[in-house]
Amino acid sequence: MPSHRVFVYGSLLRGLHNHHLLHTAKLTRAPANTAAAEFVLVDSGSGYPFALAADRARASDARSPSVLLGEVYEVNDATLAQLDTLECHPDWYRRQLTDIEGDEPAWIYLMEDEAQCAAIRGDPTRFPAVAVPGDWRSHLGRTAGK
């Protein structure tokens, strides 16, 4: 059965609310991070992050491009299709290959919807960069008591 490598950085991480979708997946690298600092991770305000390619986010001190921290899984076709459905690929999030530091490339889901990207660019107060750039789990720990 064909397998696909997927890098997860938000609600699909171990212990978070969408991780159950990976119940048949094999964890192959944790922690893991993207090889290049070319992403911006912001809080959606709804319990999950938006990851954008740096060129789709407004550059500012609070939104400097960074690597993304997460986990890499090996998934089958059916699980990849479930993830595509969750992420509304290709209209809401777009699945693309990205390099993983010290490892083989993996699929990643990046915010694609232009209206949402425009809202993120236009309202950094509503969509703040995560407290530790690229690290959703640390951000959750910092915001849990607020």
What are these regions (language model features)?
Residues 2-146:
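Glycine-aromatic micro-motifs
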